């Protein structure tokens, strides 16, 4: 509450020792660059990967940004999620092509996305969880892709078929705030928490 979601994410990433960010920008590109700049005031180095007005979806956006990301595995955090996940827990180099953070299914997505069994993420299975939008990916995941608009999901599913996707189940705070209503609900909840914390804090003279 009180700060843009992306600033919350940036602060959490900085706390985990991550200092170099690539931000995909679409229709909000001008606003983002004017507010965030080069990231220096947060102790970060930000470079931007501008997307066309019709956007490229997650897969196409990452593929376009690959020259900025280098040849090593990289962390991806969707811009429309809030979480208190400790990013320092993530593997620097996944065993396979991808490592996904999965969470309990929210009410608006009760069927989930994938299953987790013995540390491997699978498309099939009875107990399904929701992909949080947090992942560590290897550039090789995009080896056969071409520039343009495409989703990330099919690439992950293909890698799952080959046993190349690991994962973990995070049970802490996570919210998909992809709609104005869900964003307003989260903001209200965080404001209530902040107010409760202040009222429970000892005052001088206690």
Stretch-by-stretch model annotation:
Residues 1, 51-55, 145-146:
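Short, flexible loop segments at the rims of nucleotide/cofactor-binding pockets, characterized by
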Residues 1, 18, 37, 69-70, ...:
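Short conserved AdoMet
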